[in-house]
Amino acid sequence: GYTGGSLNAITRSGSNQHKGSVFYFTRDQSLVGDGPEALGEPGEFSQDSYGFRLGGPISKDNIFYFVNAEIKSQDQPTGWSLSGNSGQCYGNCDPVISAAATRFENWLAQYNYNPGSRDENVRDIPADKAFLRFDFNVNDGNQLTLRWNYVDAGNVVNRPNSFTYEYPGEAYDFSSETNSLVGQLNSVFGTNMFNEFRLTFQQIRDRRPPVSIFPWVELEDVAPEAGYFGEFEAGSEPFSTRNALDQDIIELTNDFTWIKGNHTMTFGTSNQFFEFDNLFIQNAFGSYEFSNLEQLESGVAREWEYTVVNPGQPETQQFGINQIGLYA
């Protein structure tokens, strides 16, 4: 699902000394320890992460900067295959299961669709992050901070398991890009009063496209004659055919604190303004469910769905939510 929110994080900052560092981490299947034989050999995968940080003064004692960047790439196997070359083999590599898979794939080939390899699928999971911060000592009573945070992350989702074998072509690429900009002013008045003002703007763009374009096909009871009642699935994952969400969020917060003797009093306001643009059309390419191989090859679906937008209606829904808060 999706959610809207705002970002307020305590992070590193620069100082009067220039400091920096770089890093690199890596891991692959050769670093995986031995496990139960039933799990099979781990598929090929890789995890690489590298980046740097740098901070220091722009103007000594007055203006400081800090920048941080990280790039992460990860190739992660699903843990299941039909071929048995790596990971756990669906249906214990029973020849009856393999024969059923051949009939299923041949039926799909009639429509010029290849659902993907029988080998273990390796998913791509990238993540790029950047952070930039400036601190200004305006005067003895005021400090201004500007922060920018950026995240661009993806995740190819494909989840075969012991009951349902999802072919690689059923995967979808969930990606999320976030830009966040924060301005914060901390002020001190005398010895017993201070104020914190914060303005945040956040832009979030979520996308969920399928990796292949074809109606979703589910085959139940793939090999009942062998006592196996699992499922094959191929085609575009039905909830990802038309699925995207744009969020723009503005938050304005101000807290004034007054210390009087043994009492601390805070007066404030917190206000959030949300704008959403949501696209969700399930089964935009259609979906077909077949009870067994015979029904599949006869073209008799147990159930089918196809969703269209009413003529003249927009594909997306746009709406906003505002929250105003006062407290003491």
Indicate residue ranges for each PLM-predicted region:
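Acidic, glycine-rich flexible loop segments
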Residues: 1-8, 12-179, 191, 203-207, ...
